[in-house]
């Protein structure tokens, strides 16, 4: 008896801890803080379905408790046979019609929302408005590539989009199945190797300001040992700032290095790293040859490898042993041993990669 009670207490304790930890996430890394039109629609459907489920549970629980108390066996009536009821057409109609009504209440807005979210005609129109933003998202183990086909720009890890308007996405994977998800803004949708998925999102400017100008995205499909580390950042900008960013990226030149140590790092980079990485956003290589993240704006990024704080020490840690940071990544083992001097030089060079 005491052992069972002890186990029950432990179970209750772990249950309370799980509930407490569920509320400890970062701001705007939750579907419960919608930050755009799609997120608002999905949140409304969650509230609707949850409300219906709670209503059903409460009503059934009340009826259950009432029946247990009202028709319980009383003292002295142990041998009394209760009145036998063959059935009730009225009750049968009620408990058939009510679920149908509840299903319709849930189904109608769900179907309408599904068709609205699936409307991507604007992105497939060859004569689409020049201001319509389309992003080709390519998922790789364990990093993200973002291509803006109408602007000729390619970036990695940091997604830049305009606020308060629809942004359309083409989703595909280069190796295994992944899933593109920005919890606060909407999603999620799978990226497959053999077909493209399409959808759209809207990034709210007020919510962006509250979030500090950055949203967090993740891979939401188990894809390997570093699945949990396959993050990316989203930087929504007002339309005028987004246009300025596009112009800056389109006019980007090959970086000119003046620092002697950084020059040494550039030489090391050009011997091997350049075969996979690019240092300009105007990368003309086909997708099959873009086997590693574009590093054009590496010096201005939020994170190293999508997860480490952006500083020189973490970059050196990544260069020494990428597998210790992201197990199973494809960069590990592609280059020989680097001396500390070479790592220092590479770090200096990579930190200087900025689009001015």
Curated annotation (Swiss-Prot):
It is a multi-pass membrane protein. Subunits I and II form the functional core of the enzyme complex. Electrons originating in cytochrome c are transferred via heme a and Cu(A) to the binuclear center formed by heme a3 and Cu(B). Belongs to the cytochrome c oxidase subunit 2 family. Binds a copper A center. Coiled coil: none annotated. The keyword Transport applies. The lineage of its organism: Bacteria, Bacillati, Bacillota, Bacilli, Bacillales. Keywords: Cell membrane, Copper, Electron transport, Heme, Iron, Membrane, Metal-binding, Respiratory chain, Signal, Translocase, Transmembrane, Transmembrane helix, Transport. Cu cation binds at residues 178, 219, 223, 227. The chain crosses the membrane at residues 45-65, 93-113. InterPro entries: CcO_II, CcO_II-like_C, Copper_CuA, Cupredoxin, Cyt_c-like_dom, Cyt_c-like_dom_sf, Cyt_c_oxidase_su2, Cyt_c_oxidase_su2_TM_dom. Its main location: membrane. One of its GO terms (biological process) is ATP synthesis coupled electron transport. Residues 1-23 form the signal peptide. Its cofactor is Cu cation; heme c. Residues 24-259 are annotated as: Cytochrome c oxidase subunit II. It comes from Bacillus sp. (strain PS3). Residues 260-356 form the Cytochrome c domain. Heme c binds at residues 273, 276-277, 331. GO terms for cellular component: plasma membrane. Pfam families: COX2 (PF00116), COX2_TM (PF02790), Cytochrom_C (PF00034). It catalyses: 4 Fe(II)-[cytochrome c] + O2 + 8 H(+)(in) = 4 Fe(III)-[cytochrome c] + 2 H2O + 4 H(+)(out). Its EC number is 7.1.1.9. It comes from the Bacteria. It is found in: Cell membrane. One of its GO terms (molecular function) is cytochrome-c oxidase activity. This is Cytochrome c oxidase subunit 2.
């Amino acid at each position: 008896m005491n052992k069972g009670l002890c186990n029950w207490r432990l179970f209750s304790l772990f249950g309370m801890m799980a509930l407490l930890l569920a509320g400890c996430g970062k701001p705007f890394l939750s579907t419960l803080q919608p930050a755009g039109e799609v997120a608002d629609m999905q949140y409304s459907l969650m509230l609707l379905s949850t409300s219906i489920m709670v209503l059903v549970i409460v009503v059934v629980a009340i009826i259950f408790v009432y029946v247990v108390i009202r028709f319980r066996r009383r003292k002295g009536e142990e041998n009394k046979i209760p009145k036998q009821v063959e059935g009730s057409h009225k009750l049968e109609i009620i408990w058939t019609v009510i679920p149908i009504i509840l299903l319709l209440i849930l189904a109608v807005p769900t179907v309408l929302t599904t068709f609205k979210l699936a409307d991507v005609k604007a992105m497939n129109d060859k004569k689409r408005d020049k201001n319509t933003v389309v992003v080709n998202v390519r998922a790789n183990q364990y990093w993200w590539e973002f291509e803006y086909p109408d602007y000729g720009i390619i970036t990695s890890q940091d997604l830049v989009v305009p606020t308060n308007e629809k942004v359309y996405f083409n989703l595909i994977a280069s190796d295994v199945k992944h899933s593109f998800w920005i919890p606060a803004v909407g999603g999620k949708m799978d990226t497959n190797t053999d077909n493209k998925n399409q959808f759209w999102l809207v990034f709210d400017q007020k919510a962006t300001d509250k979030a500090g100008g950055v949203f967090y995205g993740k891979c939401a499909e188990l894809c390997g040992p570093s699945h949990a580390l396959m993050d990316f950042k989203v930087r929504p900008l007002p339309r005028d700032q987004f246009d300025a960013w596009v112009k800056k990226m389109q006019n980007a030149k090959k970086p000119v290095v003046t620092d002697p140590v950084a020059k040494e790092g550039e030489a090391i980079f050009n011997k091997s790293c350049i075969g996979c990485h690019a240092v300009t956003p105007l990368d003309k290589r086909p997708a099959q040859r873009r086997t590693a993240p574009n590093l054009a704006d590496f010096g201005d990024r939020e994170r190293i490898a999508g997860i480490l704080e952006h500083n020189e020490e973490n970059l050196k840690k990544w260069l020494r042993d990428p597998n210790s940071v992201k197990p199973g990544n494809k960069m590990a083992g592609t280059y020989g041993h680097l001396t500390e001097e070479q790592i220092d030089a590479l770090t200096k060079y990579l930190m200087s990669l900025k689009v001015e």
